[in-house]
């Protein structure tokens, strides 16, 4: 295995031959370098995309901070090299290394992947290969690190089950310490005194450690579970194959968010989000039926204004960044948003700091908030109506009137903003071409009304993505729209939105289908992922890496029909591939909510009325130990039970039929 000095020597010969050498050199301000020889547990945190994207990832920043606070552990980082760098690394025999120490990833005790979305899967396999680590868990032995993954996409971990030793289900701040402690205890148990190298003595020893990890709340070790299938290809059941592990793995939750990191790494190059990012609250109470993040991050927990301000001040001092992003799934729903924005203005007034609140809900953006944001040099306004007819907004449970949208955008333009971003989705359940035409009509009307108050300079950026049904949501039963219908809807929008002041952005339909295959896929897709990667698929979210035909060929090679995963009606009593994984939102609740969507019924903000989704009973002890209003939950109402026969007989609406 190469030493750090040997790796640096080889890097010197190739770095000037690649785009952006700064991606690969490390040494950034606020990066943490510890004395390797005196640290008990070494963790490599990996974001399987390029440095420019990964270094901004908030989840990885949190874990980097958490691990490096320990005196007995270190965390270093690695990202996916771009095509040019990978080719040179392979040609010169350079394994993938951690930026801080330049040590090969294979030297670490634990490698943790962040997998927020499915299109990173082939990159994860490529990174393991570049590190000289077998891609499949079953092929690893006592000389290899433990490989884990977490992130939103792992709420259905099954398409990646063959490659990860373990998955973290849910939030990572506490469980990362449990995992490190378990590894340390195991090392003490297995090693001779004075041997500081993590070296498992046998395959059985590795299995013993994985069995220990499987007993940690929120850790899923897939090799200890077995899936069976019915003749129609659907899942029959998923059961544990060993004792003392849970039949259903429930997500890990932190009762109170720990203090946010304040020593953000200052990158060597310009990146996507060069800013201080402070998470002001976690979770969402709105219950949008398509929203994966909103369902799996319940309940809402908020940080205090004082804690946010203190962290922001420290982070700006430590980095020199000139933008502050106040992050959440719906920042304008933060209970004290006006006070927060006011006090940010008071504290940083007169500086060059720009404040942004990404992800604002139209119905919670008040005129007062607009005024405060304008006074604080806020960035552009981004709003997400998601659909353009009131019928569709009722179906997705994002109900707001057209007039509210127009009035809000008019007020924004009137206060000096010249550009607004609106996000929509196409392909929602029961959507028609008339609903898509309404998106174009609404965009035109926003521009028209904006010109009345701000003149011809107003602009609109309309981002239109394609709906992908996700696990653990009310829409996990629905099928995707067909490729033909998606392309017809996109063509309609291109024809209609040709105003020079309207910028239309559309997602590639093929990218959406790749995401859809993997988001609700079963274990059989692991072979498809592996074959697609071996055939050259990687950077699947990038135009340069798009390899749709390689995925289709991989499906064919393994005798699987991609339409089975995307364009098939799910039975109401179907066992899902993720049935043994839960975000603590009950399946019955999700089905009831789905049934209400078919009837156009809406649910109000669950801070106003608890609908008994299952979160509070699951974490009752945690809530009891943390009283107060940190959790924004009302009293629980009696849960609604559904008759199984009624579930089986209900006719589902099939999108695309």
Q: Language-model segments: which ranges?
A:
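N-terminal [4Fe-4S]-dependent radical SAM core
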Residues: 12-44, 51-52, 222, 228-277, ...
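N-terminal pre-triad scaffold of radical SAM enzymes
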Residues: 45-49, 67, 265-292, 316, ...
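Conserved SAM/AdoMet-binding glycine-rich loop
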Residues: 45-46, 119, 314-421, 425-465, ...
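Canonical Radical SAM [4Fe-4S] cluster-binding loop centered on the CxxxCxxC motif
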Residues: 57, 270-306, 612-626
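Short secondary-structure boundary/capping segments
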Residues: 60, 92, 128, 162-167, ...
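Glycine-rich beta-alpha loop elements in corrinoid/cobalamin-binding modules
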Residues: 80-190, 199-240, 474-522, 530-545
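A glycine-rich phosphate-binding loop feature that marks nucleotide/adenosyl-phosphate handling sites
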Residues: 212-223, 329-334, 358-365, 425-428, ...
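C-terminal low-complexity, glycine/proline- and small-hydrophobic-enriched intrinsically disordered tails
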Residues: 450-451, 481-597, 604-629
């Amino acid at each position: 295995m190469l030493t750090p000095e040997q790796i640096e020597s080889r890097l010197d010969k190739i770095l000037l031959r690649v785009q952006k050498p700064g991606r690969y050199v490390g040494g950034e301000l606020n990066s943490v370098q510890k004395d390797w020889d005196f640290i008990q547990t070494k963790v490599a945190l990996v974001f399987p995309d390029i440095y420019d994207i990964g270094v901004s990832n908030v989840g990885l920043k949190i874990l980097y901070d958490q691990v490096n606070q320990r005196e007995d552990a270190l965390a270093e980082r690695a990202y996916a090299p771009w095509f040019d760098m990978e080719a040179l690394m392979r040609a010169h025999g350079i394994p993938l290394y951690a930026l801080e120490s330049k040590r090969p990833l294979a030297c670490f005790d634990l490698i943790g992947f962040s997998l927020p979305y499915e299109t990173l899967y082939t990159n994860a396999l490529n990174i393991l290969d570049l590190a000289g680590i077998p891609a499949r868990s079953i092929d690893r032995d006592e000389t290899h690190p433990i490989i884990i993954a977490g992130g939103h996409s792992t709420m259905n971990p099954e398409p990646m089950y063959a490659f990860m030793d373990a998955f973290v289900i849910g939030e990572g701040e506490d469980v990362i310490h449990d995992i490190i402690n378990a590894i340390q205890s195991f090392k003490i148990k297995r090693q001779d005194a004075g041997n500081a190298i993590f070296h498992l003595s046998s395959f059985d020893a590795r299995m013993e450690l994985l069995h220990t990890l499987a007993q940690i709340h929120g850790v899923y070790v897939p090799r200890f579970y077995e899936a069976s299938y019915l003749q129609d290809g659907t899942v029959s059941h998923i059961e544990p194959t060993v004792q003392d592990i849970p039949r259903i793995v429930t997500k890990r939750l932190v009762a109170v968010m720990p203090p946010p990191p304040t020593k953000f790494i200052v990158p060597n190059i310009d990146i996507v989000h060069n800013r201080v990012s402070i998470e002001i609250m976690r979770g969402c109470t709105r219950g949008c039926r398509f929203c994966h993040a909103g369902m799996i991050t319940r309940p809402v927990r908020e940080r205090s204004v004082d804690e946010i301000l203190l962290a922001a001040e420290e982070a700006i001092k430590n980095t020199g960044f000139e933008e502050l992003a106040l992050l959440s799934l719906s920042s304008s729903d933060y209970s004290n948003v006006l006070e927060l924005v006011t006090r940010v203005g008071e504290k940083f007034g007169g500086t060059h700091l720009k404040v942004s609140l990404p992800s604002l809900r139209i119905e919670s953006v008040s005129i007062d908030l607009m005024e405060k944001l304008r006074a604080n040099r806020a960035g552009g306004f981004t709003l997400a109506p998601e659909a353009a007819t009131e019928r569709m907004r009722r179906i997705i449970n994002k109900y707001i009137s057209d007039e509210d949208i127009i009035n809000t955008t008019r007020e924004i333009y009137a206060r000096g903003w010249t550009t607004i971003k609106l996000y929509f989705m196409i392909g929602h359940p029961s959507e028609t071409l008339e609903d898509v035409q309404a998106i174009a009509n609404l965009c035109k009307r926003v521009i028209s009304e904006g010109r009345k108050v701000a003149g011809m300079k107003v602009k609109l950026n309309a981002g239109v993505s394609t709906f992908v049904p996700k696990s653990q949501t009310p829409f996990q039963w629905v099928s995707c729209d067909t490729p033909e219908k998606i392309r017809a809807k996109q063509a309609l929008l291109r024809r209609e939105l040709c105003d020079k002041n309207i910028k239309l952005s559309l997602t590639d339909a093929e990218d959406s289908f790749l995401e859809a295959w993997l988001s609700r896929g079963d274990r059989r897709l692991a072979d498809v992922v592996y074959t697609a990667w071996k055939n050259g698929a990687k950077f699947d979210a990038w135009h340069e890496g798009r390899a749709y035909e390689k995925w289709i060929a991989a499906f064919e090679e393994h005798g699987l029909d991609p339409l089975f995963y995307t364009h098939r009606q799910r039975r109401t009593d179907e066992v899902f591939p993720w049935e043994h994984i839960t975000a603590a939102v009950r399946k019955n609740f999700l089905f009831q909510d789905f049934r209400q969507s078919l009837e156009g019924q809406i649910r109000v903000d669950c801070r106003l009325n608890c609908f008994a989704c299952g979160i509070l009973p699951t974490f009752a002890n945690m809530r009891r130990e943390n009283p107060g209003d940190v959790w924004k939950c009302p009293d629980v109402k009696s849960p609604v039970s559904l008759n199984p026969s009624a579930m089986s007989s209900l006719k589902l609406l099939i999108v695309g039929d």
